[in-house]
Design a protein with these regions (language model features):
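Amide-donor transfer/coupling interface in amidating biosynthetic enzymes
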Residues: 100-185
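Structured core elements
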Residues: 22-23, 40, 75, 82, ...
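Phosphate-binding active sites in nucleotide-utilizing proteins
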Residues: 3-55, 61-66
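Hydrophobic, well-ordered secondary-structure elements that form the walls
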Residues: 39, 76, 93, 128, ...
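Short acidic (Asp/Glu) and glycine-rich catalytic loops that position anionic groups and cofactors
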Residues: 39-45, 75, 162-164
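Short, glycine-/Ser/Thr-/acidic-enriched flexible segments
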Residues: 1-3, 28-29, 44-47, 80-81, ...
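Generic secondary-structure signature for well-ordered alpha-helical cores
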Residues: 16-22, 68, 98-101, 133
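Cysteine-nucleophile active-site neighborhood
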Residues: 46-116
């Protein structure tokens, strides 16, 4: 429910690469399924479910422990928000050193180019969100996002932490298969 925005083509690409998709619910389940080799948290509306997500302490702890232990993870948009310290001061997983707050207006919308400052690679994507983030403490963002139609418009966004890559941008895995392979090795 809280995370339901996935490109069907991304899920198909993962399965074609031999990845077994194991569904679970951060709202209903008490912990991550056993034996996972990676975690993919898609977009959605965690702000609508923030109280229930926060109340599921055992799931939040399970995810944080798995990520701190090195489980590879890709979290986009709502999934990234869930991994943050909080959404509108409601406690979330607390793995990513940032806070999220909902705004009354659309913050980003449309096609973008995501430049990964650590690898130097650029990926096409799209953003659509009403949330804003603020890095906490010494944290810094690892991506530069540019509006595809107006490349002079750019902003920081997204980060790597351990084996986790997270950001607002929704990427289409087939546009850059090496990116998908790097994530799930």
């Amino acid at each position: 429910k809280a995370f339901s925005f996935y490109y069907r083509a991304n899920l198909d690409a993962l399965e074609a690469a031999g990845v077994e998709l194991v569904p679970f619910s951060p709202l209903e389940d008490g912990e991550l399924p056993k034996g996972l080799d990676g975690l993919y948290l898609g977009g959605g509306f965690p702000e609508v479910f923030k109280v229930r997500l926060s109340a599921n302490i055992s799931m939040r702890q399970s995810i944080r422990t798995a990520l701190e232990s090195g489980l590879p993870c890709y979290a986009e948009c709502g999934g990234m928000m869930y991994l943050s310290e909080s959404i509108d001061s409601t406690e979330m997983v607390g793995f990513l050193p940032q806070v999220c707050r909902m705004t009354d207006r659309l913050q980003r919308f449309g096609y973008v180019l995501v430049a990964d400052l650590k690898t130097g690679r650029t990926y096409p994507a799209h953003e659509f969100h009403h949330a804003a983030t603020e890095a906490a403490g010494e944290a810094a963002y690892d991506f530069e996002i540019r509006k595809a139609s107006r490349p002079e418009l750019c902003w920081p966004g997204g980060m790597h932490k351990g084996n986790t890559t997270a950001g607002f941008a929704h990427l289409h895995f087939l546009s850059h298969p090496e990116w998908m392979e790097r994530l799930w090795r």
